[in-house]
Amino acid sequence: MRPEFSAELSELDSTLTTIEKVLNPQEMSDRVRELEAQAADPSLWDDPDHAQQVTSELSHVQAELRKITDLRQRIEDLPIMVELAEEEDGDTSIAEEELADLRSLIDALEVKTMLSGEYDAREAVINIRSGAGGVDAADWAEMLMRMYTRWAEKNGHKVDIYDISYAEEAGIKSATFVVHGDYMYGQLSVEQGAHRLVRISPFDNQGRRQTSFAEVEVLPVVEKVDSIDIPDADVRVDVYRSSGPGGQSVNTTDSAVRLTHIPTGIVVTCQNEKSQIQNKASAMRVLQAKLLERKRQEERAEMDALGAGGNASWGNQMRSYVLHPYQMVKDLRTNFEVNDPQKVLDGDIDGLLEAGIRWRMAESQSAE
């Protein structure tokens, strides 16, 4: 085996060993047996919500345990694969592809070990609002929504759009959607902040360069254990007809719902479900998420906590997307750069997410 091949394999083996110490496969295996016993109890479904939590956790832990076991087996098999290839014809290209695949999978698993926050395993609510920049900012907000939904689709995660407020000329004023799947909040929460776009404006007949901003807010989906109870008297409910681009009505009934939380002034709208009841339920989920985040901010006394909301303008951006006069996406916190903005805008943001998660971990450790 070539020395450089052996060295990289040894490094991956060491990284996986560190991951195993953090995730503890034996404890995971014990937890699987415990959950399987609960799932086999016929009385479990007397409480459907608890039953759903048990089956969901069981499925998740089983999948993670299989992933670790499979990676360990593949690392142990790789030297044999290389040895056989060298003995037959010396072509180790298949083994090299396997090594590259293992490197990618282990890097991704290593990042997941950094998602240990209280809410990191949750699904994510994403709010996008256009900021400074007029019609270009509205168009930019819609481009960001497309970027995140494309990323979710590529990774097999369902997206439910709760609300879109369209701008008059082009783009959107705001959008709210949920990305389903384990650890979506932990991964996507690093996207929170002001995103800056520099390009030749397609809306300027003189073809001038335009800078525009959009704000991204990421919240964890609220679960029953969070105890976010909202008295009916604290919420004003308004209903209206759903509208589409240009303000056109897309529904003949008042199915869209606007919730106003009277004590805080927080407003949430939802118009994409088929009925008023469904829209109200979806809007309530988002309102609960916002109130949970407000509660966390108060407890931690941090004005820049998750979901605090910022000013999408100069001096507040966390990432720049430059399409002119050169091509580059640069995260201003991590200094991670991508020289193909279109690829990023098409949903290829894994590198940016990983860099953000590693940066957040380093910041957390340095603050201790």
From Swiss-Prot:
Task: Supply the alphabetized keyword list.
Answer: Cytoplasm, Methylation, Protein biosynthesis
| Native source organism of the sequence | Corynebacterium glutamicum (strain ATCC 13032 / DSM 20300 / JCM 1318 / BCRC 11384 / CCUG 27702 / LMG 3730 / NBRC 12168 / NCIMB 10025 / NRRL B-2784 / 534)
Quote the PTM field.
Methylated by PrmC. Methylation increases the termination efficiency of RF2.
Source superkingdom: Bacteria
PTM N5-methylglutamine: at which residues?
Q248
Q: What does this protein do?
A: Peptide chain release factor 2 directs the termination of translation in response to the peptide chain termination codons UGA and UAA.
Tell me where in or outside the cell this protein is found.
Answer: Cytoplasm
Q: Where is the signal peptide?
A: none
Chain coiled-coil ranges: none
Q: What is the lineage of its organism?
A: Bacteria, Bacillati, Actinomycetota, Actinomycetes, Mycobacteriales
**What protein name applies here?**
Peptide chain release factor 2
Q: Which SMART domains match?
A: PCRF
What would you give as a GO molecular function for this chain, any one?
A: translation release factor activity, codon specific
Is Transmembrane helix found in the keyword set?
no
Q: Mainly resides where?
A: cytoplasm
The record's family statement is: Belongs to the prokaryotic/mitochondrial release factor family.
